[in-house]
């Protein structure tokens, strides 16, 4: 009878899936769902599967309320967040929960590895700890139940933890470690060296930590970057306040702290210089690029958002497609919205005879250093240039 009750409880679980949930910060996502859900719930085993965020709940009323939350939350891009709820068996961390005796042994082992003076916990190569192996206890931190048990003990026994060493544990993903932001939020040093992490994307799962020191050497992800600067830049995207990476001091991060209550003053249009140059630049802007078309591009290399990919597809017959093309923006700039910072210019005026001395004319050679390269304009002139550089007469044979 008791076993039947346990089996029934194992079946009373619901899986909650948020498509493209990987785009959102875990804390923001869960707080948004909790605040919009009419029934309080406790998420269990939060993790990511490809680009989806998933967790489990056991209460049927909470599952029903979560269905009602779907499409009621908007992200920063004003896109609705979809939530799917389905019946499921108990999550892995619940079905394979450590027994009380195993939890007690794990706690004793972690106590031995804790440095009180430095508030540091050394869990490197934990699976092969002699005390655990002597009692046939397998603590494999890649398994969510083992990582969940470890974080639970950490929260209860080491609330002031500052340094955590997870070196050499064959970690290939950090789903189980994502709860560290709630269980041990004060951690400043994290050692993940000599593991199996293949992508810096995994670090996004623990980016809620305010890390000052991080170790990643010995992971496959370290060889995926073209150079050291690209490596440092990618890691700092997750941890902006990082000071040391793999034991090396990093330059102090540049952090611009602007009070959100202050409104930045608008840029005032100003032009000083030759009116001739102003006219030439204006002509250049009228004909130079087609930036307005970029937002409607269907180039997969440019457009990554799946929502926009679906939104921009046109499932119509030929006449409708023509209508779609006619709806594209015209190739015309809004000149009132354009500000040009001309920081480099060279002007040469040269003498180029055509048929003979009677047809000698002056030409103005204008070189503009633009953002994507050097642009050269050659224009007829009635005489030597009045622009800053002296005229250079050149005779063609």
From Swiss-Prot:
Annotated NTF2 domain residues: 280-367
Gene3D superfamilies for the chain: 3.10.450.50, 3.30.70.330, Ribonuclease Inhibitor (3.80.10.10)
Compartments where located: Cytoplasm; Nucleus
InterPro entries: Leu-rich_rpt (IPR001611), LRR_dom_sf (IPR032675), NTF2-like_dom_sf (IPR032710), NTF2_dom (IPR002075), Nucleotide-bd_a/b_plait_sf (IPR012677), NXF_fam (IPR030217), RBD_domain_sf (IPR035979), Tap_RNA-bd (IPR015245)
Database matches in SUPFAM superfamilies: L domain-like, NTF2-like, RNA-binding domain, RBD
Keywords, comma-separated and alphabetical: Cytoplasm, Leucine-rich repeat, mRNA transport, Nucleus, Repeat, RNA-binding, Transport
Record's GO cellular component terms: cytoplasm; nuclear RNA export factor complex; nucleus
Domain named RRM: residues: 13-92
Gene Ontology molecular function, alphabetical: RNA binding
Record flagged with keyword Iron-sulfur: no
Major subcellular site: cytoplasm
Family: Belongs to the NXF family.
Summary of subunit composition and partner proteins: Interacts with NXT1 and NXT2.
Functional summary from the UniProt entry: Could be involved in the export of mRNA from the nucleus to the cytoplasm. Could also have a role in polarized cytoplasmic transport and localization of mRNA in neurons.
Domain notes for this protein: The NTF2 domain heterodimerizes with NXT1 and NXT2.
Protein name per the record: Nuclear RNA export factor 5
The organism of origin for this protein: Homo sapiens
Gene that this sequence comes from: NXF5
């Amino acid at each position: 009878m008791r076993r039947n009750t346990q089996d029934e409880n194992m079946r009373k679980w619901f899986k909650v899936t948020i498509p493209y949930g990987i785009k959102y910060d875990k804390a923001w996502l869960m707080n948004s769902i909790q605040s919009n859900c009419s029934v309080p719930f406790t998420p269990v085993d939060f993790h990511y599967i490809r680009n989806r965020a998933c967790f489990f709940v056991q209460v049927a009323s909470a599952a029903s309320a979560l269905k009602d939350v779907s499409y009621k939350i908007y992200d920063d891009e004003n896109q609705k967040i979809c939530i799917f709820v389905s019946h499921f068996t108990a999550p892995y961390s619940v079905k394979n929960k450590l027994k009380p005796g195993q939890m007690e042994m794990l706690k004793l082992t972690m106590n031995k590895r804790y440095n009180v003076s430095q508030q540091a916990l050394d869990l490197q190569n934990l699976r092969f700890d002699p005390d655990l192996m002597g009692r046939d206890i397998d603590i494999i931190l890649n398994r969510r139940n083992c990582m969940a048990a470890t974080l639970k003990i950490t929260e209860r026994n080491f609330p002031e933890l500052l340094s955590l060493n997870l070196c050499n544990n064959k970690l290939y993903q950090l789903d189980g470690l994502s709860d560290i932001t709630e269980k041990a939020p004060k951690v400043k040093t994290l050692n993940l060296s000599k593991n199996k992490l293949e992508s810096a994307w995994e670090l996004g799962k623990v980016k809620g930590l305010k890390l000052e020191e991080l170790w990643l050497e010995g992971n496959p992800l370290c060889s995926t970057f073209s150079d050291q600067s690209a490596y440092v830049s990618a890691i700092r995207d997750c941890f902006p306040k990082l000071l040391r990476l793999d034991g090396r001091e990093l330059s102090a991060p540049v952090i611009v702290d602007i009070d959100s209550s202050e409104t930045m003053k608008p840029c005032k249009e100003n032009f000083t210089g030759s009116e001739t140059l102003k006219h030439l630049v204006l002509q250049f802007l009228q004909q130079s690029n087609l930036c307005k078309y970029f937002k409607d591009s269907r180039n997969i290399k440019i457009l990554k958002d799946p929502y926009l990919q679906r939104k921009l597809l046109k499932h119509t017959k030929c006449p409708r497609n023509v209508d779609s093309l006619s709806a594209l923006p015209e190739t015309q700039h809004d000149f009132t919205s354009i500000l040009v910072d001309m920081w480099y210019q060279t002007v040469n005026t040269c003498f180029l005879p055509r048929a003979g001395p009677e047809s000698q004319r002056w030409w103005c050679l204008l070189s503009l250093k633009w953002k994507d390269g050097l642009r050269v304009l050659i224009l007829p002139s009635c005489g030597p240039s009045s622009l800053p550089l002296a005229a250079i007469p050149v005779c063609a044979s």
